[in-house]
């Protein structure tokens, strides 16, 4: 019921765990750190299109068919939040897996569990 314009930030699970473990060793008490891949931010709509293209080989398409009554449902407004992990990277953390590879790995793991 939205146009998918909100921006989300993502981080591969292994990269996130490595960041958290690094914080346990090198992080400063009382400090806040952000664990997010600096290049893995994308709108929900663009993510859906990427999955349709890259993971479904363009066999599906993304359609936004938003009823006029959707505004009465109380959905949150679109957000454009780009998280900054510079502080964590200054401690030596570097994410390895990019957004497309995250989805490729997730889809392969879902096929394996069928």
Give, region by region, the residue ranges found by the protein language model.
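C-terminal substrate-binding subdomain of Rossmann-fold SDR/epimerase-dehydratase oxidoreductases
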Residues: 1-114
């Amino acid at each position: 019921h939205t146009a998918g314009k909100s921006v989300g930030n993502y981080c591969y699970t292994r990269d996130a765990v490595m960041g958290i473990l690094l914080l346990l060793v090198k992080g400063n008490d009382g400090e806040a750190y952000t664990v997010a891949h600096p290049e893995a931010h994308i709108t929900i709509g663009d993510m859906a299109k990427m999955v349709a293209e890259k993971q479904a080989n363009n066999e599906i398409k993304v359609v936004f068919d938003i009823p006029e009554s959707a505004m009465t449902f109380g959905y949150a407004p679109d957000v454009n939040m780009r998280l900054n992990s510079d502080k964590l990277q200054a401690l030596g953390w570097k994410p390895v897996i990019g957004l497309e590879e995250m989805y490729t790995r997730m889809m392969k793991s879902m096929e394996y569990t069928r």
